[in-house]
Amino acid sequence: MLSNTLRSNFLKFYANRHHAIVPSSPIFPHNDPSILFTNAGMNQFKDIFLNKETVSYSRATTSQKCIRAGGKHNDLDNVGHTSRHLTFFEMLGNFSFGDYFKKQAIAFAWEVSLSVFNFDPNLIYATVHEKDDEAFALWEQHLPSERIFRLTDKDNFWSMAETGPCGYCSELLFDRGANFGKATSPLEDTDGERFLEYWNLVFMEFNRTADGSLLSLPSKHVDTGAGLERLVSIISGTNTVFEADVLRLLISKTEELSGKKYHEDEALGAAFRVIADHTRSLSFAIADGLLPGNTERGYVLRKILRRSVNYGKRLGFTKPFLAEIVPSLVDSMGEAYPELRLSLSQIQEVMTTEEENYFKSLHRGGNLLQQVLKSSSTSSLISGEDAFKLKDTYGLPLDEIALLAKDYNFSVDLETFYQLEKEAKERSRKNIAKSQNATDAIYDSLSLGENSEFIGYNDLSCDTFIEAIVSEGKQVSSLQEKEKGALILKSTPFYAEKGGQIGDSGEIFCSDGTFVVSHTTSPKAGIVIHHGEVSQGQLSQAQAVTTQVNCIRRKRISNNHTGCHLLHKALEMTLGDHIRQAGSYVDDSKIRLDFTHPKAISPEDLASIELLVNEKIRENHQVETRNTLYSDVVNSKEIKQFFGDKYSDVVRVVSAGFSHELCGGTHAEFTGDLGYFRILKEHAVATGIRRIEAVTGKEAEILAHQDNEDLNEIALILQSPRDQILHKLQNILEEKKEQAKQISELETKLIHSLLDKLIDHCQQVNDVSFLIHHLPESESHRLQQYANCLHQKIPSRLISLWTTQKNGKYIIFSRISDDLIKQGLQAKDLLKILLAPCGGRWGGKDIFAQGSADSLPQTDALNNTLWQWISTQLN
């Protein structure tokens, strides 16, 4: 694969020039709610550019996996209809953090273009900002001035936000030749097809203030990005990014599955392109831990999947198919991104389940659309509200709604539809903004010295001082007795909630007062917030204090965290290598672990998992921790790490017997400290995600004791020895089953006896028999059974109506024999005639239907209505 070669050579080029090769960050940013998905290589370095984070390197290079399908950068609707729009792409990049600047960045880019990309230097063009004389002069060392163009802020100025770091940028373009347009320069090439941009170099040299002024940054940075798919297309000489390398491979697999050819019909070309691109987006997102859902990122993911299905229908797919394409993707990209291989079964399971659900929704939506069309008897217009509901709730695409409406000479109120869609998007945008603002901004504005020093791995108390106090969203100088607030300390033994572990509680005290810590959080890196209340006295900023963590609670939390690691490893050993943590939570009372697995775990496997964890507890292994460079363990198969998590340069490895994980949490000293481990329950929390809840130590002992007491109580009730309980229960169930069978047979005889009498009361319209009978509420659950039995006795020319009352409402059930259906009679039409005047509701099929209403006409009136309806229908 050319993409694998290019990626590898690009990274090697910069590594040989003292750049750290930094792994791609997750497809979604963990600590940046301002964007839905990672959409550029610089996202993971944002805090470095903002001077909020320091790293051990000043130069870096990456191949970043990106998705642009939501928010400001949203290419979703264009994918499939242009030559180069993608929702998923890889961004090659090199970065300098206060190290080299324009001169070296431009020299590197030129050398890479010639030696790595093997571009003809005579076909390379550059653009610079109109005011960037320095960049222009530097490019003149490599290019004639007539191939360097000055452009405005619109094209060649980059900013992270309205204020903050920003700077000029320079783009590199490749002339693909006259076959791609008649333009003779990038200025004439308005669609960018001939002179194709392949690399953008951003020079962060300014800080934009609120009044728009540009101030020079004390430390200048470089951020570059080159789209890998676009480079592959240029080098391969293809017209589009879809005709080369990985994307063409996925299109070929789709051709094989569909039996259609990509270039056979241009009208179908978009479908092949959409499926190839969307399969990549979905696979990488699921591998990083995202799942389709109804909000934010999950909603976008579901939208991508459903768009794939909609286009797949154009190729003849009527059942799930995406999972069959994924192995081709894994074969081509799994070496560079091992998370794809590890998550293959999970990706396929999620895709298939989502597709099945969507096909069901489409079927329901189609039926609902038919109802909408039939109910619009006075108009030939489907309301915008109905159309939007069909799309938003049931997933029926607008184009399918419009096509089906056209078959009935209906049209759709598009103006209202688009307005509702706009309002829904605005609500979604506001929800995202609300989520973004949820992090208390006060902590960003505090003037603090160095980050809070955490000493809690080894010490549970220390002497320190108060750096800041926050109360009711603002910084204050002191807290009085009974006042609630948050303290920030110079150093702390309190563990802040993160990594699935709950934060510590305890006390902070001084000569003037005591502050009871209820919980501890870390809203931003390096800051530990101690939340609580002054129980007596007062505390002031800069005051010397003594801290004391609740030792007993911390011990239980630490034991449970170690238990979570042991459980994770036991799951993998029992169920297979596909097991991946999808979330966890540990506190002082329980363990909760979410993990990837396609089905419920059998009781036998759960027992094996529990036994294995307890075996490791009895072996009493020392729990060891060590710090090491992430680069030394990133490819280790023995040490568990979680794709989707972002790790720093130095990581902490926790080893407990057979378990080895990257983890920053607190742990037991020995596995034997856990005492005992019990699983409480196992259940599904999402498609392909299971959850186990468990306990250790005293809680596990209490559970075992309760189980023992329950068994004693059951034995007493059954009047059976404990070792005979199971046998006794089996006998009882067999007896109950036999009794139920006898009751059912007796009920059937009684029903047939009643029906024999009712047959004599059937009325006639021409040669059609019809019956109306009211059942008592106690028999309301047997409406359909009565109807079916009667129609077995009289299989033709029969219509029956059965009514009853339930919870104050009238229930009515209709059944029509098959031969009358062939003459055009339908059970649901009959109920419509009967219930519409009463304001009732109904639904069903041709052969039977059911409805309800607050009131019904008297039996004579029902007889007359039924008689008239039959006469009209048959005549």
From Swiss-Prot:
Top-rank EC class of the record's enzyme: ligase
Highest taxon of the lineage: Bacteria
Annotated keywords: Aminoacyl-tRNA synthetase, ATP-binding, Cytoplasm, Ligase, Metal-binding, Nucleotide-binding, Protein biosynthesis, RNA-binding, tRNA-binding, Zinc
Name the record gives this protein: Alanine--tRNA ligase
Main location: cytoplasm
Binding positions (Zn(2+)): H561, H565, C663, H667
GO molecular function, one term: zinc ion binding
One Gene Ontology cellular component: cytosol
Pfam families attached to this UniProt entry: DHHA1, tRNA-synt_2c, tRNA_SAD
Cofactor(s) essential for the protein: Zn(2+)
Annotated catalysed reactions: tRNA(Ala) + L-alanine + ATP = L-alanyl-tRNA(Ala) + AMP + diphosphate
Domain comment in the entry: Consists of three domains; the N-terminal catalytic domain, the editing domain and the C-terminal C-Ala domain. The editing domain removes incorrectly charged amino acids, while the C-Ala domain, along with tRNA(Ala), serves as a bridge to cooperatively bring together the editing and aminoacylation centers thus stimulating deacylation of misacylated tRNAs.
UniProt entry tagged with the keyword ATP-binding: yes
Purpose: Catalyzes the attachment of alanine to tRNA(Ala) in a two-step reaction: alanine is first activated by ATP to form Ala-AMP and then transferred to the acceptor end of tRNA(Ala). Also edits incorrectly charged Ser-tRNA(Ala) and Gly-tRNA(Ala) via its editing domain.
Family indicated by similarity: Belongs to the class-II aminoacyl-tRNA synthetase family.
Any one GO BP annotation for this protein: alanyl-tRNA aminoacylation
EC number: 6.1.1.7
Cofactor, how bound (note): Binds 1 zinc ion per subunit.
Database matches in InterPro entries: aa-tRNA-synth_II/BPL/LPL, Ala-tRNA-lgiase_IIc, Ala-tRNA-ligase_IIc_anticod-bd, Ala-tRNA-synth_IIc_core, Ala-tRNA-synth_IIc_N, Ala-tRNA_ligase, Ala_tRNA_ligase_euk/bac, DHHA1_dom
Coiled coil: none
Localisation per UniProt entry: Cytoplasm
